[in-house]
């Protein structure tokens, strides 16, 4: 049995990452490959296809034995990559990642931007490299590192989609289409989650899940002067607040429906305490609070449970609210 040389493995992975993966991630950042939910013209724009082309071109440069690559695109659906690396040991592993991106947003630091790769020390700034462009590169390099030392490995497959940020609506069709090619994985590795620090490998055991929706409140067919209409016509903003208050306690942030909550077991609390023992105050202090803003809980265990196990309402956007410089004395229609 070949013994793994950890020092050599680390040196090889670091070299491959710096010399091969990072230059590609720079190019990946430059592609505004918004997920279909944020780009209705994604097919015509071709940015998702560009990420597919970029990654498959990189794969062609990697001396990985037993590698086969297939790009799938069903009619009207986003493209998907399916790779297979033949195993030299029993077992099957499935790696998952995605190449589509969230919208670019605003507020980037001076000299940085969503489609402009900037490296400062160990940090690479730009949209999508962490969520989730790195995933395929990291997985492929990990298998290559084993081959480089002659270490037997199981058959490894990689499924890389381009609509995850839209809720993966196209993925089920591809899972059915590629069923015979996906095998029967003994282990699924999803390289698309967070971590506590850079000193150890973190495993995500559970995600809270997400229910997304759009709340619309309309009160009039056209804008009317607020001085004339307020007090007679209801405020769409007030109605929205009332509806949100059915769901969320505005004083505490706690969500009201019982069905959104789970019982926090003693085991979960004990696990959370162990994590807090490792990470300490960084659990809270790593967030960019403004001066005077306090965390909702200063108890580390309670903060961790709230972050990972308790439901929360997050409002991520609003329409129908004019910018301040355009907000005249007009009652909003919606």
Predicted regions span which residues?
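Short, solvent-exposed beta-strand/turn "edge" segments of beta-rich domains on protein surfaces
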Residues: 232-233, 326-334
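Short connector loops/turns at beta-strand edges and beta->alpha or beta->beta junctions
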Residues: 30, 34, 115-117, 216-222
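N-terminal helical capping/dimerization or prosegment-like subdomains
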Residues: 2-107, 333-334
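Active-site metal-coordination/substrate-binding segment of hydrolases
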Residues: 90-160
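Flexible loop/turn segments at secondary-structure boundaries
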Residues: 37, 79, 101-103, 165-168, ...
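A structural supersecondary motif
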Residues: 303-329
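Fold-level recognition of mixed alpha/beta catalytic cores in primary-metabolism enzymes, strongest
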Residues: 129-298, 302-313
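Short, internal active-site loops enriched in acidic
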Residues: 34, 75-77, 162-166, 263-265, ...
């Amino acid at each position: 049995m070949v013994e793994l040389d950890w020092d050599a493995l680390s040196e090889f992975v670091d070299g491959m990452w710096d010399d091969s993966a990072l230059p590609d991630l720079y190019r990946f950042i430059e592609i505004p490959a918004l997920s279909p939910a944020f780009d209705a013209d994604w097919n015509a724009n071709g940015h998702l296809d560009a990420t597919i082309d970029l990654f498959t071109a990189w794969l062609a440069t990697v001396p990985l034995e037993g590698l086969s690559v297939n790009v799938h695109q069903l009619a009207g659906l986003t493209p998907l990559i399916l790779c297979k690396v033949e195993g030299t040991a029993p077992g099957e592993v499935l790696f998952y990642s995605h190449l589509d991106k969230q919208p670019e947003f605003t507020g980037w630091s001076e000299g940085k931007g969503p489609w402009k790769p900037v490296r400062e020390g160990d940090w690479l700034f730009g949209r999508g490299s962490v969520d989730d462009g790195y995933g395929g590169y990291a997985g492929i390099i990990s298998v290559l590192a084993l081959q480089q030392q002659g270490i037997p490995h199981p058959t490894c497959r990689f499924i890389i989609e381009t609509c995850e940020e839209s809720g993966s609506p196209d993925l089920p069709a591809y899972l059915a289409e590629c069923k015979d090619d996906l095998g029967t994985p003994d282990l699924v590795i999803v390289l698309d989650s967070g971590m506590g620090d850079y000193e150890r490998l973190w495993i995500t055991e559970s995600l809270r899940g997400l229910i997304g929706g759009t709340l619309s409140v309309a009160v009039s067919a056209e804008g009317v002067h607020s001085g004339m209409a307020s007090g007679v016509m209801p405020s769409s903003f007030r109605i929205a607040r009332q509806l949100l208050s059915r769901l969320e306690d505005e004083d505490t942030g706690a969500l009201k429906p019982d069905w959104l909550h789970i019982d926090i077991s003693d085991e979960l609390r004990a696990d959370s305490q162990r994590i807090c023992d490792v990470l300490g105050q960084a659990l809270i202090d790593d967030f960019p609070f403004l001066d005077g803003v306090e965390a909702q809980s200063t108890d580390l265990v309670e903060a961790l449970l709230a972050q990972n196990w308790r439901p929360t309402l997050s409002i991520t956007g609003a329409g129908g609210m004019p910018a301040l410089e355009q907000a005249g004395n007009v009652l909003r229609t919606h």
